[in-house]
Design a protein with these regions (language model features):
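Short, surface-exposed amphipathic charged segments that create phosphate/polyanion-binding patches used
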Residues: 11-23
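Acidic/histidine-rich catalytic cores and adjacent linkers
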Residues: 7, 27-220
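Inter-helix linker motif
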Residues: 1-12
């Protein structure tokens, strides 16, 4: 369990919460449409609600790391709202969609900061992770209770993922955190080769194809 997969689990869980919330608002809007139909006896087009619009187009305000968000100060015209609005305005409206959303962002960002500042310092990460586990497991939000249990279960692998190692890339040696990404990438190449070849009956032939496809120095 490395840094990427920990964050992937958390972002996926929050995203599922937002998608379910969007379904609830869509169901509410459909109920309103049906009420209008039963009252007036004809179909009536209802514009997409503010809540569904924000959840469809601006989930990234919660899912993206805050340090990566680009806020534009100059208001831009929004055709749905029919007025000028900037990123801060969208953020304010998005956070007001549900009482949990601001808490989710604060709790997520706390782990993001922990993950960033301890790169290359596994001893410090080991000291801080216990506090996070306790905080998340004591949370009133089920998503973060589960997240705390995940951190507890994979505590040692997560701490080890803060170790920095030298890697060889196209531009030479660079420093990077321990990750199972490289081996997953290699496994994916094997699967792609098998899929493109529609299977192989001869292992030696497949092995040679794989070694040739993953060679570092091209043959001219």
């Amino acid at each position: 369990m490395d840094s990427f997969h920990v964050m992937q689990w958390l972002i996926h869980s929050i995203d599922m919460f937002l998608r379910n919330l969007q379904k609830e608002y869509k169901a509410r809007d459909e109920s309103t449409r049906c009420e209008i139909f039963s009252k007036y006896g004809h179909q009536h087009r209802i514009n997409i609600s503010d809540e569904v619009y924000l959840l469809k187009k601006y989930r990234w305000l919660l899912l993206a790391n805050q340090e990566h968000l680009e806020y534009h100060l100059e208001p831009r015209y929004d055709r749905h709202f029919r007025f000028f609005i900037n990123t801060f305005g969208y953020e304010e409206k998005f956070l007001a969609l549900h009482p949990y959303i601001k808490d989710f962002r604060d709790l997520k960002e706390e782990y993001v900061r922990f993950n960033s500042r301890n790169a290359g310092n596994p001893l410090k990460a080991a000291e801080e992770i216990d506090y996070l586990i306790h905080k998340y497991c004591s949370s009133e939000h089920h998503i973060f209770v589960q997240f705390g249990n995940l951190l507890r279960k994979y505590k040692n692998p997560i701490i080890n993922s803060f170790i920095m190692v030298d890697r060889l890339g196209p531009d030479g040696i660079y420093n990077s955190r321990l990750s199972n990404g490289p081996i997953e990438s290699l496994n994916r190449k094997v699967k792609d080769l098998k899929r493109l070849g529609r299977g192989f009956r001869n292992f030696e032939h497949m092995r040679n194809r794989f070694l040739f496809a993953t060679r570092r120095n091209p043959i001219y």
